[in-house]
Regions:
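Conserved alpha-helical substructure of the radical SAM core
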Residues: 2-144, 155, 159, 167, ...
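Small disulfide-bonded, cysteine-rich extracellular recognition modules and tandem repeats
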Residues: 22, 64, 264, 326-329
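A short, charged
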Residues: 314-325
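Short cysteine clusters
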Residues: 54, 58-61, 261, 279-280, ...
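Radical SAM enzyme [4Fe-4S]-AdoMet core and its adjacent flexible, acidic
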Residues: 1-12, 49, 70, 75-78, ...
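Short, basic and Ser/Thr-rich N-terminal targeting/leader segments
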Residues: 44, 263-264, 319
């Protein structure tokens, strides 16, 4: 049985967390049926941003291409601990990334260790193009790590991961697998994420072989998000690997933007400075909810601004730019390959 699923189940098999999760799922279903936002429970998931600073310059990332408008910084360990303590009995999963490279935060290992003591299920995403303390990482209690590497050669990888180090990323993945074996640890569950673009779509078959050889737990292929007609050149030639319909310089999502969004019921975001976002697609924090340093989580979660947003997406979600380019409801992970162990 998948050890990652077991770890996830354990995190939620706590009375209050389980009740909260079941309750909010029912709330969401009723909200869709009644077209009225009903929220009487906490979300099961919380995304926390350790930092919005990155060491790479990926051209389709707002942080990497310099178009992120928010102030840059790193979440303090004290703020992280404050948030965790406030929601530890209600929320089961912490997603520890947003706009930035989490391991650039010098307190990140301590954050992982603290979250483990609070019995959260934790997952993070990294470019792994920096020196990692592999032993401490495996011992930290982190449940899942997503490593982004979009190529099986340095030449392919460097076309998108500007300023990245292919050899270092590969070494970190290999060392992580070996350290897990050495310490007889099932954690963290290692996911190799491969963003499909025009320049690497020809490597899809080979990367599956490579992932199995490296004993990676799971390989995930993901579609690419673009923001302007200038970005179309990154889209793969094979349209089944794209989330967009394309006609010349015009691109639209393959699926209709429906008047619903589970993330507003299940997965809020708190940025490095304490500002709450409605979701991770609001990368610049354009929709202001409030700051966790000035309000409690419950005040923000059940506050007027969040309720107003929930009501509006049930009526006309397409009015928001971020929603019109959102992958919600689209199968973004085209294919997954699990390693045979």
């Amino acid at each position: 049985m998948n050890t990652d699923y077991i770890a996830l189940a354990k995190a939620f098999l706590v009375k209050q967390r389980l009740c909260q999760t079941c309750g909010i799922v029912c709330n969401y279903g009723l909200s869709l049926a009644l077209r009225k936002p009903l929220v009487h429970f906490y979300p099961p998931i919380l995304m926390l941003e350790p930092t919005n600073i990155c060491n790479l310059h990926c051209p389709l990332c707002l942080t990497g291409n310099g178009k992120l408008l928010r102030p840059k910084g790193m979440m303090s360990l004290s703020l992280f601990q404050k948030i965790c303590r406030e929601v530890q009995d209600k929320i089961g999963m912490l997603i520890l990334w947003n706009q930035g490279e989490p391991f650039l935060n010098p307190d990140f290992y301590a954050m992982l260790e603290f979250a483990a003591k609070q019995k959260f299920y934790t997952m993070t995403s990294t470019n792994a193009s920096l020196e990692l303390n592999i032993e401490r990482l495996v011992k930290s209690g982190l449940h899942k790590i997503i490593i982004s590497m979009d190529g099986i050669t340095a030449e392919t990888y460097n076309k998108y991961r500007i300023n990245g180090n292919f050899e270092l990323v590969l070494k970190n993945m290999q060392d992580l697998v070996l350290m897990k074996e050495k310490l007889h640890s099932s954690k963290p569950y290692i996911v190799w994420q491969f963003l499909i673009m025009k320049h690497n779509e020809n490597e899809i078959e080979e990367v599956q072989k490579m992932a199995k050889e490296l004993k990676i737990d799971k390989l995930e292929f993901k579609t690419t998000q673009i923001y302007s007609s200038e970005d179309i050149t990154f889209l793969p030639s094979n349209h089944k690997y794209s989330r967009y319909l394309q006609e010349g310089n015009i691109f639209t999502l393959k699926t209709k933007v429906k008047n619903r969004c589970r993330r507003l019921w299940t997965q809020p975001v708190i940025n490095w400075d304490g500002e709450m976002n409605i979701c991770c697609y609001d990368k610049n924090g354009s929709i202001k909810i409030g700051n966790i340093q000035e309000h409690s989580f419950s005040e923000l979660w059940w506050g007027e601004k969040m309720q107003k947003m929930r009501k509006e997406v049930l009526i006309n979600r397409a009015k928001y730019d971020i929603c019109r380019n959102c992958g919600e409801g689209i199968v973004q992970k085209i294919k997954t390959v699990k390693s045979e162990r």
